[in-house]
């Protein structure tokens, strides 16, 4: 296997689509845990599905008909369920970067609590600007202290409610 002969010099993450099946998620998690050159997985990328948009009243019906990748808040629940499954499979043996629907400290707290070691933002940066990062970090830090945790690492995978 040529890939396993690579020396681990840089962190390498595999970014997965929210359309991934449970079977493929389990396979990729197992491969990632057993390959030295893979540091972790990124869950998840944009989706081409619009299914979650039909569940809410939509003032912007054009979003349902739009083609291309959908990102941001509509992905939050789907992404969270995939992160939770991956964490249960991997049991903390590889890093998980949570992506999709992170707009505030509560969203960040939830993703970390179900298993994400780190987070990636995009849509909230576009709509709220770079200060959203400070807002998220401040709220997250306050909530971690409120829950009696020493640091963010103590939250990873603990399934602690934000409320």
Predicted stretch roles:
Residues 12, 19, 26-27, 31, ...:
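Outer-membrane beta-barrel porins/channels
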Residues 33-34, 38-92:
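Glycine/Thr-rich beta-alpha phosphate-binding loop at enzyme active sites
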Residues 20-35, 87-92, 102-119:
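Catalytic cores of alpha/beta
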Residues 40-48, 101-102, 108-135:
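Glycine-rich phosphate-binding active-site loops on the catalytic face of alpha/beta enzymes
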Residues 76, 138-163:
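Extended, intrinsically disordered, low-complexity segments
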Residues 5-18, 88-98:
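Short beta-strand/loop segments at the ligand-binding rim of alpha/beta enzyme cores
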Residues 1-7, 33, 83-91, 137, ...:
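Surface-exposed amphipathic alpha-helices with a cationic face
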Residues 51-68, 125-150:
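C-terminal helical cap(s) of enzyme catalytic domains, especially alpha/beta-barrels
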């Amino acid at each position: 296997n040529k890939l396993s002969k690579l020396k681990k010099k840089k962190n390498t993450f595999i970014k997965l689509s929210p359309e991934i099946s449970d079977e493929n998620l389990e396979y990729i998690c197992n491969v990632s845990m057993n390959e030295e050159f893979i540091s972790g997985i990124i869950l998840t990328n944009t989706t081409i599905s619009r299914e979650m948009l039909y569940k809410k009243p939509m003032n912007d019906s054009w979003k349902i008909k739009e083609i291309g990748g959908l990102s941001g808040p509509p992905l939050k629940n789907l992404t969270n369920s995939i992160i939770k499954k991956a964490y249960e499979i991997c049991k903390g043996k590889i890093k998980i970067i949570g992506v999709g629907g992170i707009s505030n400290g509560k969203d960040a707290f939830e993703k970390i609590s179900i298993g994400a070691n780190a987070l990636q933002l995009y849509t909230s940066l576009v709509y709220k600007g770079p200060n959203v990062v400070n807002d998220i970090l401040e709220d997250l830090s306050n909530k971690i202290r409120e829950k009696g945790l020493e640091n963010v690492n103590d939250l990873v995978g603990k399934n602690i409610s934000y409320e």
